[in-house]
């Protein structure tokens, strides 16, 4: 039996809310409340999830847990103010980990490469900051997310491809991680919708979706049993999920391509 994990619980909360909105069944709402209470019990007085998180490490991608809790808070009026206060406590701690150039410390899902986090977990963190800032109507969280998102968009548009990891000076290393690319594309889409003058976000999103589509439909992906699947690394022998086709990579790509389709229909 594996111990519960804060980040994984946040992912489940997203799914349970979608199920609750679709079915209206109270069991999902009741389960979500129990899960949220448990998550907040892992938050310390400084705003860190200091217990029961992945590897026992203190990390900033708890923002991606806070965001769905804020969405759920709209269904729990009695808890809303307390949950928002706890959310701010965590988000404020995350901002203490962000440098002036928008790079985030304590953002990797390993110990030995925490000094140069993967874009997969960077994207989780920035997306959570942006959504939480939007839900709380607090520009400081949104601006922190936009700053990091724009830095990575510039890197991508200049080079045509992102590295898999970036250090505190935004120097890249290792192979591109398509999962993180898809996640960033989702974030760039949100930013472009919120600010029509953020042309960089619209351009980066569109270019990334083209790149991901090419990767997912070329080479080995012409075989029927893996057609359309997005690989862990590009090239495939990169260090993240080497020679693998992780389901979450394809999931985020599908989300991003659906955004692209909706954007095209709207414009």
Show where each model-derived region lies:
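Glycan-recognition and catalytic cores of secretory/periplasmic carbohydrate-active enzymes
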Residues: 1-267
């Amino acid at each position: 039996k594996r111990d519960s994990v804060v980040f994984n619980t946040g992912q489940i909360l997203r799914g349970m809310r979608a199920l609750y909105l679709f079915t209206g069944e109270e069991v999902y709402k009741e389960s979500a409340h129990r899960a949220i209470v448990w998550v907040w019990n892992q938050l310390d007085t400084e705003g860190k999830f200091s217990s029961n998180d992945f590897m026992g490490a203190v990390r900033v991608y708890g923002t991606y847990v806070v965001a769905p809790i804020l969405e759920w808070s709209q269904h729990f009026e009695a808890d809303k103010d307390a949950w928002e206060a706890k959310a701010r406590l965590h988000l404020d701690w995350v901002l203490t980990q962000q440098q002036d150039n928008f790079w985030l410390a304590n953002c990797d899902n390993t110990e030995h490469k925490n000094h140069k986090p993967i874009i997969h977990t960077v994207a989780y963190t920035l997306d959570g900051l942006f959504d939480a800032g939007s839900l709380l109507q607090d520009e400081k969280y949104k601006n922190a997310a936009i700053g990091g998102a724009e830095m990575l968009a510039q890197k991508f548009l200049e080079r045509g491809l992102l590295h898999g990891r970036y250090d505190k000076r935004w120097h890249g290393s290792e192979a591109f991680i398509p999962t993180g690319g898809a996640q960033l594309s989702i974030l760039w889409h949100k930013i472009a919708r919120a600010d029509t003058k953020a042309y960089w976000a619209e351009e980066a999103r569109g270019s990334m979706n083209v790149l991901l589509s090419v990767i997912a439909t070329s080479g080995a992906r012409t075989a029927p049993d893996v057609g359309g699947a997005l690989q862990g690394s590009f090239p495939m022998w990169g260090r993240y999920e080497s020679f693998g086709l992780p389901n979450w990579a394809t999931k985020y790509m599908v989300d991003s391509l659906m955004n692209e389709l909706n954007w095209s229909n709207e414009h």
